Amino acid sequence: QTVQVEPPYYAGDGEYLMVDLIWTQCEPCTQCFSQDSSSFSTLPCESQYCQDLPSETCDCQYTYGYGDGSSTQGYMAXEDGSSVPNIAFGCGDNLQIDSGTTLTYLPQDAYNAVAQAFTDQINLPTVDESSSGLSTCFQEPSDGSTVQVPEISMQDGGVLNDLQNLAVSFFPTQCGAS
C-alpha cells in the first residue's frame, strides 16, 4: 500500500522549495532554536535506512550530492511524534541556510526582510496571492518588457554565494491564476 504525504506549506511562511530531502534542526546545533523532542532518535545500525546506506562502517552517516556539485553530510535520524510515524531524515551538520533543500525555514522576521528587499528591487506591482501561499507574486509588465530580476546572494560563514537562477523559482502561470 502506498500513502502519499503532502505537508501543508505556504511560501509566505519562509520556506523555499527545491529538492527531495527533508531537513530539520538537529543536535549538535549552535545558535539554534530551543528543541526538546521525546520522539526524536538517531537510527541504530540495524535499521533498514542505515543498512541501505553505501557505507563500510556502522555509523549511519550519509553524504548527499546536489546537481551543482555541492554536497551535504550528516547522520540519519527518525521522528515518531508526528501524524506520520517513523519519518527518517538526514541531520546535516553546521547548515545555516541550505538553498537547495526541499524546505529551508527562515524565521518570519528574516523571511520578511528578504521578501521586502526583493520586492523593492524588482519594481513591479504585486498581486495578492496570500490565500495560495504566494506572498511574493508580481504582475507582469503590461507592455511586454523584460523583467530585470535583482541579483541575489547569500553570505555563509564569510563566503558569498551567488544564488541567481539557483534558488529563485518563477512560475508566471501560477501568479494571479485562480
UniProtKB/Swiss-Prot annotation:
Its EC number is 3.4.23.12. Optimum temperature is 45 degrees Celsius. Thermostable up to 50 degrees Celsius. Retains 44% of the original activity after incubation for 30 days at 50 degrees Celsius. The active site is at D98. Inhibited by pepstatin and by diazoacetyl-D,L-norleucine methyl ester (DAN) in the presence of Cu(2+) ions. It is an enzyme of class 3 (hydrolase). GO terms for molecular function: aspartic-type endopeptidase activity. It is found in: Secreted. It catalyses: Similar to pepsin, but also cleaves on either side of Asp and at Lys-|-Arg. One of its GO terms (biological process) is proteolysis. Pfam families: TAXi_N. GO terms for cellular component: extracellular region. It comes from the Eukaryota. Optimum pH is 3.0. Retains 80% and 60% of the original activity after incubation for 30 days at pH 3.0 and pH 4.0 respectively. Unstable at pH higher than 5.0. This is Aspartic proteinase nepenthesin-2.
